[in-house]
């Protein structure tokens, strides 16, 4: 087995799927670790092509020899909730001004999507996490 490469950096970014380019914030974040920026952009765009229109978080591990690996995550819960509720952004005062509604079924659907990234044992627990996020954004959860 090949010897382990030494990790020199871990970069977390949230980038539009299929739309990574060397402009800020991607260029400076990768440049300071000496990563080939265009190589990352091409690999990321190819990996997220099917999810266009979503924001996809990515965790980039940079090694001593300036090579890298990356892992894409599921879109942020807040983004999925906004899309399902049909609102542009959450409420500035979530406990007084409500901006939209979600059904329990929509919560479970989002929970199903986010399941691999959530710290929950089953879909019901994951749906409660999603419902809590929605409430803190000023979106009412029915059911």
From Swiss-Prot:
SUPFAM superfamilies: Ribosomal L11/L12e N-terminal domain, Ribosomal protein L11, C-terminal domain
Keyword Cell division: no
GO cellular component, one term: cytosolic large ribosomal subunit
Xref: Pfam families: Ribosomal_L11, Ribosomal_L11_N
Keywords annotated in UniProt: Methylation, Ribonucleoprotein, Ribosomal protein, RNA-binding, rRNA-binding
PTM summary: One or more lysine residues are methylated.
Spans through the membrane: none
GO molecular function: large ribosomal subunit rRNA binding; structural constituent of ribosome
Gene Ontology biological process terms, A to Z: translation
Disulfides per UniProt: none
Gene3D superfamilies: Ribosomal protein L11, C-terminal domain, Ribosomal protein L11/L12, N-terminal domain
InterPro entries: Ribosomal_uL11 (IPR000911), Ribosomal_uL11_bac-typ (IPR006519), Ribosomal_uL11_C (IPR020783), Ribosomal_uL11_C_sf (IPR036769), Ribosomal_uL11_CS (IPR020785), Ribosomal_uL11_N (IPR020784), Ribosomal_uL11_N_sf (IPR036796)
Taxonomic superkingdom: Bacteria
Membership in a protein family: Belongs to the universal ribosomal protein uL11 family.
Xref: PANTHER family: 60S RIBOSOMAL PROTEIN L12, LARGE RIBOSOMAL SUBUNIT PROTEIN UL11M
Subunit note: Part of the ribosomal stalk of the 50S ribosomal subunit. Interacts with L10 and the large rRNA to form the base of the stalk. L10 forms an elongated spine to which L12 dimers bind in a sequential fashion forming a multimeric L10(L12)X complex.
Protein role: Forms part of the ribosomal stalk which helps the ribosome interact with GTP-bound translation factors.
NCBIfam families: L11_bact (TIGR01632)
Protein name as it appears in the record: Large ribosomal subunit protein uL11
Organism ancestry: Bacteria, Bacillati, Actinomycetota, Actinomycetes, Micrococcales
Gene behind this protein: rplK
């Amino acid at each position: 087995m090949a010897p382990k490469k030494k990790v020199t950096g871990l970069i977390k970014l949230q980038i539009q799927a299929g739309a990574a380019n060397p402009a800020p914030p991607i260029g400076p974040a990768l440049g300071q670790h000496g990563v080939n920026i265009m190589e990352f952009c091409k690999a990321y765009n190819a990996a997220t092509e099917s999810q266009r229109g979503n924001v996809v978080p990515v965790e980039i591990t940079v090694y001593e020899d300036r090579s890298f690996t990356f892992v894409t995550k599921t879109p942020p819960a807040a983004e999925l909730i906004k899309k399902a509720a049909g609102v542009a952004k959450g409420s500035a005062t979530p406990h007084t001004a409500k901006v939209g509604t979600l059904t329990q079924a929509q919560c479970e659907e989002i929970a199903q999507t986010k399941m691999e990234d959530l710290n929950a044992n089953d879909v019901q627990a994951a749906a409660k996490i999603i419902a809590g996020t929605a409430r803190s954004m000023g979106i009412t959860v029915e059911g």
